[in-house]
């Protein structure tokens, strides 16, 4: 793919001469440039003085900050502050960073998603969402469906950037020799029939009944209503789960549950759920809380949490049906099905 389209070529084609699109393209390019530096920093790890150790402080959501969290946050803020922006929202900051209220866009981002994986050399990433400035509406208070662009970077065996600007989903991979992202997949569509689900099964006892019912259907395999043998995945990294779904299909569930502080799940709406939902829907998939479409939700606070079920549209719709129709599970249960893994 020596002559593959570069990310900067892609954003130029997208923007044309439209002022709003030019602002969006500039923000995407800035985040991409920062991510290339971050990929180098992450890849060198301890050789670059990165230990993955806690810094003795917590971010706005209560997570313990690590040295790499802080550095990556600084790198993205530095890149975005060079551009016109109305407001910036970072997972690592308690409050918004305000710029020019008349600037055309605001950006929400998680600079280093999954930083707890650094110690084990597992996948981490960066997630971002770009929204328009709306006259009379405070930044980041509109529903997710107003997003202009969303994307995430996966720092894995390859460094890849997934992007949507509202016209499908493209995937770019970092050419390390040239220091540019090059497109490897265009107009990605999520496979619909992959029998895979991802959930942290250790929390089974805390789940709501509809989530239990869905997982039981998957575990029932060919003898259950799904009529397929499912595999369970759990990578412990939102960006890695999302990338796998885009390329392989399946469904990811991080529901709300009965633990104190987990009724709305753990993921943050503005810079995790909203951008992932936009990407999933643009790739022909779905994203729901179980009861509502994620893109219909508007944040009440910067770091508001929300449940997230995302992936192949049929599986997301099934989870929604089980939440909204309590009798759905009993209607589809085979009369003589074997007990599932979690059944008592």
From Swiss-Prot:
Binding-site residues, Mg(2+) 1: 91, 110, 112
Cofactor: Mg(2+)
Binding annotation for Mg(2+) 2: 110, 113, 272
The entry's keywords: Calvin cycle, Carbohydrate metabolism, Cytoplasm, Hydrolase, Magnesium, Metal-binding
Cellular component, GO annotation: cytosol
Matching Pfam families: FBPase (PF00316), FBPase_C (PF18913)
Family: Belongs to the FBPase class 1 family.
Name of this protein: Fructose-1,6-bisphosphatase class 1
Gene source species: Rhodopseudomonas palustris (strain BisA53)
């Amino acid at each position: 793919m020596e002559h593959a389209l570069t990310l900067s070529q892609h954003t130029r084609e997208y923007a044309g001469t439209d002022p709003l699109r030019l602002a969006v393209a500039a923000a995407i390019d800035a985040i991409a440039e920062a991510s290339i530096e971050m990929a180098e920093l992450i890849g060198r790890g301890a050789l670059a003085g990165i230990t993955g150790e806690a810094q003795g402080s917590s971010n706005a959501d209560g997570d313990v900050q690590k040295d790499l969290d802080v550095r990556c946050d600084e790198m993205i803020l530095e890149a975005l502050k060079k551009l016109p922006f109305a407001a910036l929202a970072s997972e690592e900051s308690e409050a918004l960073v305000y710029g020019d209220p008349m600037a055309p866009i605001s950006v929400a981002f998680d600079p280093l998603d999954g930083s707890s994986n650094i110690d084990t050399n597992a996948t981490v990433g960066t997630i971002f969402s770009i929204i328009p400035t709306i006259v009379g509406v405070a930044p980041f208070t509109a529903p997710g469906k107003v997003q202009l662009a969303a994307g995430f970077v996966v720092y894995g065996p390859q460094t890849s950037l997934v992007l949507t600007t509202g016209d499908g989903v493209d995937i770019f991979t970092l050419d390390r020799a040239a220091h540019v992202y090059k497109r490897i997949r265009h107009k990605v569509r999520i496979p619909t029939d992959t029998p895979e689900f991802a959930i942290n099964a250790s929390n089974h006892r805390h789940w709501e009944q509809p989530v239990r019912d869905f997982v039981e259907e998957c575990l029932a395999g060919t003898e259950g209503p799904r009529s397929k043998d499912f595999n369970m995945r759990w990578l412990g990294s939102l960006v890695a789960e999302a990338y796998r779904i885009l390329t392989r299909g399946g469904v990811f569930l991080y529901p709300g549950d009965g633990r104190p502080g987990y009724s709305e799940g753990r993921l943050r709406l503005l810079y995790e759920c909203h951008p992932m939902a936009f990407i999933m829907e643009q790739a022909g998939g779905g994203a729901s809380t179980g009861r509502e479409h994620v893109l219909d939700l508007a944040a009440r606070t910067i770091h508001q949490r929300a449940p997230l079920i995302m992936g192949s549209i049929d599986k997301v719709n099934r989870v929604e049906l089980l939440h909204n129709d309590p009798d759905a599970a009993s209607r589809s249960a085979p009369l003589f099905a074997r007990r599932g893994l979690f059944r008592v």
